[in-house]
Amino acid sequence: MNPYQYTASIKEFFSTDENYIIGFLTQSNAFDSRRTTIASWKEEINTLKKALINYRGENGFVAFEYTIPRVDGRIDCIIGLRGILFVLEFKTGETQDINVDKEQLMQYVTDLKNYHFESYDIPIAPMWVVPSADVPVARVIRPVTNENIFGLMCVSDSTISDVVKKVLTSEYANKIEIYANNWLHSPYCPTSNIVEAARKLYANHKVEDINRSDARGEDLIRTTNAIISLINQAKARNEKYLCMITGVPGAGKTLVGLSVATLHQNEEHTNRSVYLSGNRPLVMVLQEALARDARDRSKDELEKKLASIEDKKEKIVYKKAHKVNMTDIRSRIKQFIQPVPNWRKEYLKGILVSGEGEEASFVKDLNYQYKGEGEYYIPYDHVSIYDEAQRAWEAKENASYVRKKEKHLSNFPEWSEPRFLISCMDRHPDWAVYICLIGNGQDINHGEAGTVEWIRSIKHFDNWQTFAPSDILHDKEVAKEANGLKINFLDHLHLSTDLRSMRAENLAAFVDAILCMRIETAKGILPELDRYPIRITRDLKKAKRWVKVNARPSERYGALASSKGQRLKPEALVLLPANSSETEVIPWFLGDKSNVNSSFYMEDVATEFQVQGLEIDWAVVAWDADFRYSEEGWKQYQFRGSKWMNINKEEIRRYQINAYRVILTRARRGMVIYVPEGNNEDHTRKSEFYNSTYNFFKQIGIKEI
């Protein structure tokens, strides 16, 4: 099926009767063919002919109703001429600017530039066309970044030809030839951010619909299909599997987990999946984003239904009976996206400890009076998906927590969180699958057990089989623990490519080279990040201005820092607390530009604890004196009282390095690293604390703003 409704060369367009063109446009049921729409098409055709009258004999093409593949967007008109791609949005019969629609147009342009293969190197000129408006000739806003996207130009039918002429005579024209057939049928490679992806998955899209169509996207699809195949196999054979999925930051592990969870949400009870995460901010943001999206879709469906009801009384009754209830929506979503503590607490109910030490086990408390519905002892879900499973608690941390919180389990044995969670799924009499999504080098807090604990725990369950990529053996501790354990190695369970930074597949490697101080490696990778701008500055105002200028209207930007960066406060950068509440996290990620608590204000600074597993488009990464460059290696500090203290404990040092790994890989489109000048009058912010780090980044070759 063609992605457009009508296309022709410019020569053919001028020689074709407008009624013939409209006939093509009305043939498809996908578009409205009401009289008002036909009138709008006529006005668009006439305006387009006015714009191109001086180019009617040139090579070029036009296309109407171009559908952006898999993005649910449709562009009114495309013009390819003299190496320039014009993207036109018409507001026929209107004279008022509508900012929301303008943002949507710029989002379409950004999508084309980033995901549409044939548009990568083509200058794109977006035009907001109001044919009947009385507007002066628009100023042509030339591209200000290396993306080659002109600023939005607002035109009427009387000014469009002059604006087109200015663009076509600019220095950006005639540098590349646009072949109509190649462009119209170009591969499309979208990579949604995690919130957008979750929304689409919950709305019954498949992972193929929201992922890139190139080899890197196929990697994600293969992993998803491999997991689905294992689930079906476990069910068919009445077996129990532990499946481990590994991957670099941003490779799509969360996307795989959400895909599996949403795939089974409407199926019978025996196939239900639950998505779990110990990352509270991630859960809060996903739950709220999905709830808002579901509410909006429900309202749209209700309005459509009400429009079809003519009787006023019947309409009132129907509206009352089908009122959109946000509480109910949130409740449904929380059934399949849950924080780990909530799920764990549910299955700590009604159990008793039998035996002691290594002989300890759990049994059902036959005297327990369960007040809920259904079975409390056996998990409702046959498939459990633990995102960021490397952050599960070690034995002492888990046992201590349970003993304090659950009075009936004061004798809870020293079982790690992985061991207890697997034991819960082991209560199923038939089959079960536990899926661990593991981020390499992303354990960031005290008490987190790491990948090795899952290997150690599964040894206690002889009736379970383990599936994992051979990549897990790169960790020496894991390899040692896995010795003697039969693991079914499936390399499709490893995701090796960063999809978050869609213009920089080597970003993870670049960040790793920085943190490991492999300077020559970092220098070698940096030129490969030409489509992912990285800058450095010592001026916070410049840093904020840079992300604002680069960000498109629909893109999110914000400030990030390490949680140990406690002396950024004098720079008016306030770190969000590690245990942030919903009122802090949700506005930061989902609030719009009118919300002072949103990321856009760059006053509240998110740390690794808020952003791990999530992402923004552009980031100001504030680099404090907690992590200082020296020729001997990174010097690591934490702020205690009124001074910086050396971090000597290896575990804490690793957490801090991973914190910087997280914040340096959160931005999908680009970032600027802000290194303060310091203040020699403040003993906690001396210039010498910062200068070596700044010079290190300059040495690598990162450009200054």
In which residue ranges do the predicted regions lie?
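Conserved RecA-like ASCE ATPase "motif II neighborhood" in helicase/translocase motors
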Residues: 318-425, 603-607
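Conserved helicase/translocase motor-coupling segment
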Residues: 257, 444-448, 470-625, 629
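N-terminal pre-P-loop "Q-motif" helix
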Residues: 194, 199-202, 209-241
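Signature of the SF2 helicase/ATPase Hel1-core->accessory helical subdomain module
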Residues: 385-481
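Hydrophobic anchor at the beta1->P-loop junction of P-loop NTPases
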Residues: 245
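C-terminal accessory regions
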Residues: 430-433, 599-705
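Conserved lysine of the Walker
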Residues: 253
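Accessory nucleic-acid engagement/destabilization modules that flank
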Residues: 1-190
